[in-house]
Amino acid sequence: MKIGMFGLPLTGKTTIFSLLAGIPFDGSFKTEADEKISRIKDERLDTLAKIYNPLRVVYATLDFVDIPSFDMTADKKEKNKIFQMIQNVDALLLVIRAFRNDQVPFPLGNETPRQQLEALRTELIIRDMEVVENRILRLQEQKRKKKPTPEEEREEVLLGLIQKELEDGNFAS
């Protein structure tokens, strides 16, 4: 499973990523995603290995992706770059800053964990709305050219339901 770590600047994403991946924290600001595989130690598997003595023991793994910080003031092109990285993960881990440090300023206008969460939620919902609206438009254009397949008709109905949820400020899942 690939888990993307997503959050505003200076929230501690890379610090948490380093701890989960078992690598030293270098403190650098990244513009590209960093990916590491973390082996999940399981004592039950160790016990079974002692009992059955297999040729090798394969532990479960998690793939962590440290997505660059999401800058609320960035232009659309930069935001899209981050959203494309998000599309390549199976799950999102939102990292919200809940510590105070005078040396590390809060992201502009997002000084409480609730404000940070709402800002990220809003950005994700807006992005999902753009994707859904674009797909609905493409389906409607195709409908004018040729008769839609039953699958395309179901997709358009489903996208309409998803669009309604997003417009109400809810995630689709």
List PLM regions with ranges.
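Conserved C-terminal guanine-recognition region of P-loop GTPase G domains, centered on the G4
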Residues: 52-58, 71-173
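Conserved G1/Walker A P-loop phosphate-binding module
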Residues: 1-101, 108, 114
